[in-house]
Amino acid sequence: MRETPEREEEPGTEAPCAASCHAQRILQTLNAYRRSGTLTDVVLRAGGRDFPCHRAALSAASAHFRGLFAAGRPERAAAVVPVGPETPGTAAALAVVLDYVYGAGVRLRAEDEAAAVLALAERLGVAGLREACARFLEGRLRAANSLALRRVAAAFSLASLAERCGRVLRQAFVEVTRHADFLELAPDEVAALLADPALRVAREEAVFEAAMRWVRHDAPARRGQLRRLLEHVRLPLLAPAYFLEKVEADELLQACGDCRPLLLEARACFILGREAGALRARPRRFMDLAEVIVVIGGCDRKGLLKLPFADAYHPESQRWTPLPSLPGYTRSEFASCALRNDIYVSGGHINSRDVWMFSSHLNTWIKVASMHKGRWRHKMVALQGQLFAVGGFDGLRRLRSVERYDPFSNTWAAIAPLPEAVSSAAVAPCAGQLYVIGGAGQDGVNTDKVQCFDPKEDQWSLRSPAPFLQRCLEAVSLEDTIYVVGGLMSKIFTYDPGSDVWREAADLPSPVESCGVTVCDGKVHILGGRDEHGESTSSVFTFDPGTGQVEAQPSLQRCTSSHGCVTIVQSLSR
């Protein structure tokens, strides 16, 4: 019978799992030898306990022992090698490390044990155990231990654990601040936590109370940190009654002279609303309150229909919410602005004197006192808690007329007229004064004049002319700088009243006029308007003064131009 030759294995092939199973059996045998003291050639001593081991196994798994047992080192022949520090915790941690080295797996029971094992594994250079400890800690992460684990993450550069700790701190801020670890934070850590715009708090009162709880934990030593911490509390978002009863009446704050400017800023915001311009008046990202952009009325694509809609847009969620329609919506080319979180709309075609207020609290439109002079193509802005209706057109001529509205007395009064009559100009308040930029003059010719009103002196003056001659302009102010767009210009221009200097800020993707412009979340938003073909658009762009970048945003719900556009703070749960 002919023998069949044995089939030769191809080089490099092996039975499935043969190598890994073989390695596992070797580790299991070595671990059994370690536990029984068989063939061990070194003893590790930690916390009063001895651990017989094999130098070869330790050297294979640990960079520290590999170097320690290298040829020429005096410790190479040592029978006993101490592993510090000499504490019971070190012994327990070393037991876990050796189980890992010998393939017995990692069994962790508590966060402090995992932190001790992690520290020892780092010292001994045991690769892989670091990741196992990090995964265990991530699985045990809770609000109660988030601050402690954040310190562990920082100490050992565990990026994933640090990110998860930060998320828990933001999402469970109120619960975190109730634990003792919060009271032991360093001032820098408390300030950084309070400053986070993404804290998930329903009310800013929770942030204020956390700051004061930390200070009162050791008031004599910490009262000097009050101003620094209070800078990160958004005092204008507190309920006015709470501010009076809990903040201004607080003895620690009364004794802190450095805190007084912050309290005065909050008071100004209660009186003036967003006009005060305080960054601390912006709601945090995940509050129920948020800045929303309100778009009111306007003309359709061809300019034939007057749109009745009023809608609020939340940029963070990109969600539109309908509001009650503007009464008398058949008017166009009216003016709008926000004052103390209410929206005012005045005038409109043809020659209307009407003024309506949208109460954001009552969610309804209320008619208030009419202007003395009917007008459209004018502008209206808020300055020092009052409204100013500026210039415009009455059907016969462009107007020099300026009227001031006092919301407390519900009355309009004429003030010093414009040096030069204009309509369709850009108007913006900035640094306590009123600026009227460009527009169409009495002869119908566009002007580049910048007319400045000082309310203290009830007097107008001229400033440096604009670098353009345009009408149908819009302007807003942000941090003592005026931003001008529209007039079918392809650029955004800035004007600094302090230096009386004009600059080009950015290029726009496409020119528009009679657009809506407002400031929301620290950015300039440009909404709708007419393009170079005279048609209304639905385009939306944002300009970030910090980066100088213009970005396209989701379009409006419909094409519109000559519309009202303001920013208010609104509850998102409505």
Swiss-Prot record:
Record-linked SUPFAM superfamilies: Kelch motif, POZ domain
Superkingdom of this protein's organism? Eukaryota
Give the matching InterPro entries: BACK, BTB-kelch_protein, BTB/POZ_dom, Kelch-typ_b-propeller, Kelch_1, KLHL35_BTB_POZ_dom, SKP1/BTB/POZ_sf
Q: Which Pfam families match?
A: BACK (PF07707), BTB (PF00651), Kelch_1 (PF01344), Kelch_KLHDC2_KLHL20_DRC7 (PF24681)
Q: Which cysteines bridge via disulfide bonds? A: none
- Keyword Kinase assigned: no
Q: Which UniProt keywords apply?
A: Kelch repeat, Repeat
**The BACK domain, residue ranges:** 146-248
Q: Where are the Kelch repeats?
A: 292-341, 343-385, 386-432, 434-480, 481-522, 524-570
Q: Where is the BTB domain?
A: 40-110
Q: Identify the PROSITE patterns for this entry.
A: BTB
Protein name per the record: Kelch-like protein 35
**Which organism does this sequence originate in?**
Mus musculus
